Amino acid sequence: MAAAAAAGPGAGAGIPGASGGGGAREGARVAALCLLWYALSAGGNVVNKVILSAFPFPVTVSLCHILALCAGLPPLLRAWRVPPAPPVSGPGPSPHPASGPLLPPRFYPRYVLPLAFGKYFASVSAHVSIWKVPVSYAHTVKATMPIWVVLLSRIIMKEKQSTKVYLSLVPIISGVLLATVTELSFDVWGLVSALAATLCFSLQNIFSKKVLRDSRIHHLRLLNILGCHAVFFMIPTWVLVDLSTFLVSSDLAYVSQWPWTLLLLVVSGFCNFAQNVIAFSILNLISPLSYSVANATKRIMVIAVSLIMLRNPVTSTNVLGMMTAILGVFLYNKTKYDANQQARRHLLPVSTSDLSNREHLRSPMEKPHNGALFPQQGDFQYRNILLTDHFQYSRQGHPNSYALSRHDV
């Protein structure tokens, strides 16, 4: 298993069977984390649906999630000794240069604020979709994310995919269409909200990886920064939409349920925070392909648990559409992973002469910018393809430069 390989060379050296025992313990830890991830994700979605069915204020639920992220991440970052974000460079040369690379002067307004707005908008849209349509259908629509990623990568990054990758999108489209036409509790606004959330998550996926690559910020540190900035977008929306409704509404039926509602909101915020941290930890332990399988399994678990707990009316054709879409997501991930591995094999030199030739033919050398090296356009496209599914979260990908990111839960 990939997690066993991540233990590092020399683990258990000189002790017969130590390597196998370490691999078994690593596998057991990954399995336990996956089960906990599934339970938190499924439970959190069921709790969200229960809240929104009796308390139809999706912005309030989103605000609780963002606040839980802002309150819970800083202690973890300190406990795991996650390095702080690099300082922002000034307009001129600094008299006391920093020991490491600096961020561009307009890094926060140009990159962080748009990503924070995307996080806010995606969270609100996702909760509106869960409010309007069943959890099972909302998660089926979220399976269209690979379609959006491929389209947006082609438009924004000029990234072309192989024919196999495009063909792997067909089951996703077919499954979502089948689930939509057979959905008994269909709602147009629920579908639009789910699609908007998925589109926004896809944009975040593309640009977050670009920001992480260029800035070298730790992924959990970036998550904390985006959450704190998203609060500034969330609070005005909450005041205008939900708080104003609380103050002027004559229907006070839900006031008597405030203690129960507040408890559910706390549970929902904790589940969202915990599953975010555990998802990053799992991705840090296993290969991207194994993670994609675990993520597809998690979506199946969420749909199954929601159907059992919430008793949504479904047909066999509706379930077939859901499973087809999820199977399509797995096929897409497998095809994309194989394509990236093939590209990596072409990139690696097989002899010293190959290495010399590639060094000679390399596009103009990276330009130093505030102490950091940034690649020119020549190999940007390949690096972007390689980073799409296998990024800095994986300990196998960057064992040396990201040793500090190997935080296990």
Swiss-Prot record:
Protein task: Putative transporter.
Superkingdom: Eukaryota
Membrane-traversing stretches: 50-70, 111-131, 133-153, 165-184, 188-207, 222-242, 252-274, 282-303, 312-332
Coiled coil: none
Protein name per Swiss-Prot or TrEMBL: Solute carrier family 35 member E1
Primary location class: membrane
InterPro entries to which the protein is assigned, alphabetical: Sugar_P_trans_dom (IPR004853), TPT_transporter (IPR050186)
Native organism taxonomy: Eukaryota, Metazoa, Chordata, Craniata, Vertebrata
Keywords assigned: Membrane, Phosphoprotein, Transmembrane, Transmembrane helix, Transport
Xref: PANTHER family: SOLUTE CARRIER FAMILY 35
